[in-house]
Design a protein with these regions (language model features):
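A short acidic, helix-capping loop that chelates divalent metal ions and anchors anionic groups
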Residues: 28-32, 121-128
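A short, terminal or domain-edge coil/loop segment
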Residues: 112-118, 148
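Charged helix-capping and loop-helix junction motifs
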Residues: 131-134
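Conserved strand-turn element in the central/C-terminal portion of the radical SAM core barrel
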Residues: 139-158
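Conserved alpha-helical substructure of the radical SAM core
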Residues: 1-112
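A cross-domain feature marking catalytic cores of carbohydrate-active enzymes
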Residues: 65, 90-94, 117-119, 153-157
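Short secondary-structure transition/capping segments
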Residues: 104-109, 138-144
Length: 158
């Protein structure tokens, strides 16, 4: 197998949270959230794919945003990955994960779904949004068998 070349790809500004560290919302001027069009996504995908072909690499994508699941063409993009046998990781938030979504992500080639935990409940919820801590723990446990995350101590932290 050819070595990987990784791309971190920001596909949308849309997000359910307003994290204090987030570059999208840090200046307070977020009235116009941006997302790539489907045409831009296809162009970007094929540019990355062609780059990897030229340099003998296997493309690997880290999808991020905002929350990539909120992009209107998110599932179309995953079909494109699947059609080209490209694996990926999602850097997202927990609010749109359920058993069915996790199974579909795995089927499309998702190897990991990164959820951030910024401390105990009070700190995490202050940093992200109220209720995020409990939702993150709940979804971390849901995603464990699908995405091979091993966090056995998480329930004890709540």
């Amino acid at each position: 197998m050819k070595p990987y070349f990784s791309f971190q790809w920001h596909i949308t500004d849309e997000c359910d949270q307003r994290c204090k560290h987030c570059y999208i919302f840090s200046d307070g001027k977020h009235s116009c959230l941006k997302s790539m069009t489907w045409e831009q996504m296809q162009d970007t995908f094929y540019n990355c794919f062609d780059f990897c072909e030229v340099f003998g690499r296997t493309p690997y994508f880290y999808l991020t945003g905002g929350d990539p699941i909120l992009h209107p063409d998110f599932w179309r993009l995953l079909e494109l990955f699947h059609d080209h046998d490209i694996k990926f990781t999602i850097l997202g938030n927990p609010f749109h994960l359920n058993d069915q979504v996790c199974r579909e992500l795995k089927w499309f080639g998702c190897e990991r779904y990164q959820l951030s935990l910024d401390g105990l409940r009070e700190t995490h919820d202050w940093f992200r949004k109220p209720g995020s801590y409990d939702c993150t723990l709940e979804k971390q446990i849901l995603a464990t068998p699908i995405c091979e995350i091993k966090q056995n101590d998480l329930p004890a932290a709540s």
